[in-house]
Amino acid sequence: MHGHSRNGQAHVPRRKRRNRFVKKNGQCNVYFANLSNKSQRYMADIFTTCVDTRWRYMLMIFSAAFLVSWLFFGLLFWCIAFFHGDLEPSPSGPTAGGPGGNGGGAAPTAAKPCIMHVNGFLGAFLFSVETQTTIGYGFRCVTEECPLAVIAVVVQSIVGCVIDSFMIGTIMAKMPRPKKRAQTLLFSHHAVISVRDGKLCLMWRVGNLRKSHIVEAHVRAQLIKPYMTQEGEYLPLDQRDLNVGYDIGLDRIFLVSPIIIVHEIDEDSPLYGMGKEELESEDFEIVVILEGMVEATAMTTQARSSYLASEILWGHRFEPVVFEEKSHYKVDYSRFHKTYEVAGTPCCSARELQESKITVLPAPPPPPSAFCYENELALMSQEEEEMEEEAAAAAAVAAGLGLEAGSKEETGIIRMLEFGSHLDLERMQAATLPLDNISYRRESAI
């Protein structure tokens, strides 16, 4: 049911908010379901499974592995001692042939145990812990009476070394992982679209909160939106690249201070036909990725974020955050996410803006100051030659009419021509052309 506003206009219901494919903190909002043999596949790659798992789960797994191995071999040692008869109480008291008896026979000798000083399961468990951890208290030990007990000690020592090596290797592989390094790489809360150098551009800001650098840092961006092919196939997550300067190397950045990443909306951009109104009604997501190597460990790290269509501000720019001080540059991160509105930003799409420039705006005429000085001198010389030709023709006409060569009139005409040529020469010498900035820019451009 459509509602109505107070002024009588129909109220258009808001589009359902799109589920993020990548969350703002960089986590991918994807759930895997109905995987066949998932446990077997994860156990086949147990090392990667342990490295990817959380610390608390990993410590619980290794603690359980140690405890199970201690209990298993403790039970094994207890069984060996039990079946050998080491757990039975030794006979005590005087014998028939001993002192106070009538007989003169010797006392019976007690059998040698397999494991010394193991009188129950608790003692066997302690002996198992001492063997696997190589504590070596020296109170309990295995004798040569039972070869099975010796074999059990050897096997437990090997198993203990394997568990220790696996745990240490997993911890050493997990500790230097640059996963948490992405927490100190910052993306702006919003992206903006405004005019830069006469073209509409999509921009967002990235920053590094640590003083340690990200080596070989480079950025990528992809637009994800539903797409219907010509054959009617529906693609819910169609991915299109956004060019951020791959061809000329602008995608590689020196991330010491916050930098604004620019995507120029041109003919190859998926946003080329999208204006302000289309942006408000579109359903898409822009995933931005920052990759590089951690300076301390030389391991590759990746930071991700995303912007929905509702998080892109049309006609805005980012406030400056880098300020020059007397001896250094100051970065004010309190302004990192702030933007300001730019008046005069066109609301049309980049395609319409380009077409309006081609069809409506005429080419500006060249300014008079664009003429070079040599062309001006050539024009003046041509005028002077024409005046001399006219003077020669007048002299020829006067000679044809019978005028004397030395007459005063001819002398006056010649002096007049010389005076005119002298004035032209002074005008040429005093001629200066005012060259403005536009002419200089054009000459440098040529």
Curated annotation (Swiss-Prot):
Which residues are listed under the site Role in the control of polyamine-mediated channel gating and in the blocking by intracellular magnesium? D164
| Span of the annotated motif Selectivity filter | 134-139
Give the catalytic activity: K(+)(in) = K(+)(out)
Molecular function via GO? inward rectifier potassium channel activity; PDZ domain binding
Q: In which tissues is it expressed?
A: Detected in kidney distal convoluted tubules (at protein level). Widely expressed throughout the brain. Also found in some peripheral tissues.
Location of this chain's protein in the cell: Cell membrane; Cytoplasmic vesicle membrane; Postsynaptic cell membrane
UniProt entry tagged with the keyword Metal-binding: no
Per UniProt, the keywords (alphabetical) are: Cell membrane, Cytoplasmic vesicle, Ion channel, Ion transport, Membrane, Postsynaptic cell membrane, Potassium, Potassium transport, Synapse, Transmembrane, Transmembrane helix, Transport, Voltage-gated channel
Residue spans that sit within the membrane without traversing it, per the record: 121-132, 133-139
Q: Which InterPro entries match?
A: Ig_E-set, IRK_C, K_chnl_inward-rec_Kir, K_chnl_inward-rec_Kir2.3, K_chnl_inward-rec_Kir_cyto, Kir_TM
Highest taxon in the source lineage? Eukaryota
Instruction: Answer whether the UniProt record assigns the keyword Transport to this protein.
Output: yes
- Membrane topology of this protein: Multi-pass membrane protein
For this chain, the annotated S-S bridges are: none
- Segments spanning the bilayer are 56-80, 149-170
The record's region (Val/Gly/Ala/Pro stretch) falls at 91-111
User: Which residues point to the Cytoplasmic side?
Assistant: 1-55, 171-446
Extracellular side stretches: 81-120, 140-148
One GO term (biological process): potassium ion import across plasma membrane
Among the entry's GO cellular component annotations, what is one? glutamatergic synapse
Q: Give residue numbers for sequence motif PDZ-binding.
A: 444-446
Q: What family does the Swiss-Prot or TrEMBL record give for this protein?
A: Belongs to the inward rectifier-type potassium channel (TC 1.A.2.1) family. KCNJ4 subfamily.
Describe its partners and assembly state: Homomultimeric and heteromultimeric association with KCNJ2 and KCNJ12. Interacts with DLG2 and DLG4. Associates, via its PDZ-recognition domain, with a complex containing LIN7A, LIN7B, LIN7C, DLG1, CASK and APBA1. Interacts with TAX1BP3. TAX1BP3 competes with LIN7 family members for KCNJ4 binding.
**Biological function:** Inward rectifier potassium channels are characterized by a greater tendency to allow potassium to flow into the cell rather than out of it. Their voltage dependence is regulated by the concentration of extracellular potassium; as external potassium is raised, the voltage range of the channel opening shifts to more positive voltages. The inward rectification is mainly due to the blockage of outward current by internal magnesium. Can be blocked by extracellular barium and cesium.
Tell me the protein's name.
Inward rectifier potassium channel 4
